[in-house]
Amino acid sequence: MDFVRPHLLAIEGLHPPEIHALLDLAESYALLNRSGKTQRDLLRGRTLINLFFEDSTRTRTSFELAGKRLGADVINMSVSTSSVNKGETLLDTASTLNAMHCDLLVVRHSQSGAPNLLAQKVDAAVINAGDGTHEHPTQALLDALTIRRHKGRLEGLTVAICGDVLHSRVARSNIYLLASLGSQVRLIGPPTLIPGAADRLGVEVFHDMDRGLDGADVVMMLRLQRERMKSGLVPSEREYFRFFGLNEARLAKAKPDAIIMHPGPMNRGVEIESRVADDPVRSVIKEQVEMGVAVRMAVLDALARQRSRLPSSRPV
């Protein structure tokens, strides 16, 4: 089964074969990127616009690199100097972008649902690069690809997601994806940072780090999202690390071959110790960044082919 949807707005609602199709295509691009070969004809003559209403380094750069490696004309729109900063509404922005006839629109916005709204108003294929606390689908895909490359599978693995789950769109997308593909997901954090309805998602919830990490195959750490927090959710960063920071002693509770992940940006000494983050064997944080480019190439490829009604193919 190919990925034949007009947009990528969320992981929730995708069928497992669609997810596997994107992961398989991304694996092909990961191998292509490591070989030094290019696929610059695929999006030649197509325009990709990165529209980021929130600051981003990794995601925007990753999409830009993915587009350029496929031959697209890539435009990065700076919201701080655009008409949006002068009071233009999101719908007016959509109308303006539609008049430009771009082919692919990558959107990051502080409000949940903004990419969905744009997808209803523009002719371009829209990719959600993170919307509020809702979802971040390409991050979940790159995380899944990284896990699959190290573990050979996703089904049957125990994945511990630790930290500020309440405000994390990354956590939500990962929960939907991992549960869909047969992983057992654990959420670890203080009660103030775990969603109240988490039990409805088919996950296990732990408020004790040692218990939650016991026997885990994958440990995924999340940063404290101070910019989205109300005051009083955690007493202090020092206290937070004392109970929920990942150090070598806590990591020993997981399986000996457990891998360490983090979507970035990292706050060293708050949610993760430097020695753990930089572990040359178990940390796959740098590989996550690498797989991000491959995943975004796969998503751009799949959406562009869907718009052109071209048959799916693997890069060579």
Curated annotation (Swiss-Prot):
Catalytic activity: carbamoyl phosphate + L-aspartate = N-carbamoyl-L-aspartate + phosphate + H(+)
Pfam family, one: OTCace
Keyword Transferase assigned: yes
Biological or metabolic pathway of the protein: Pyrimidine metabolism; UMP biosynthesis via de novo pathway; (S)-dihydroorotate from bicarbonate: step 2/3
Source organism, top-level taxon: Bacteria
GO cellular component, one term: cytosol
Keyword terms: Pyrimidine biosynthesis, Transferase
GO molecular function, one term: amino acid binding
Residues the record lists as binding carbamoyl phosphate: R58, T59, R108, H136, Q139, G264, P265
SUPFAM superfamilies: Aspartate/ornithine carbamoyltransferase (SSF53671)
EC number: 2.1.3.2
Keyword Protein transport: no
InterPro entries listed in its UniProt record: Asp/Orn_carbamoyltranf_P-bd, Asp/Orn_carbamoylTrfase, Asp/Orn_carbamoylTrfase_sf, Asp_carbamoyltransf, Asp_carbamoyltransf_Asp/Orn-bd
Binding residues for L-aspartate: K86, R169, R223
One GO BP: 'de novo' pyrimidine nucleobase biosynthetic process
Subunit structure: Heterododecamer (2C3:3R2) of six catalytic PyrB chains organized as two trimers (C3), and six regulatory PyrI chains organized as three dimers (R2).
Role of this protein: Catalyzes the condensation of carbamoyl phosphate and aspartate to form carbamoyl aspartate and inorganic phosphate, the committed step in the de novo pyrimidine nucleotide biosynthesis pathway.
Family recorded in the similarity comment: Belongs to the aspartate/ornithine carbamoyltransferase superfamily. ATCase family.
Alphabetical list of PANTHER family matching this protein: ASPARTATE CARBAMOYLTRANSFERASE, ORNITHINE CARBAMOYLTRANSFERASE, MITOCHONDRIAL
Protein name: Aspartate carbamoyltransferase catalytic subunit
The species this protein was found in: Granulibacter bethesdensis (strain ATCC BAA-1260 / CGDNIH1)
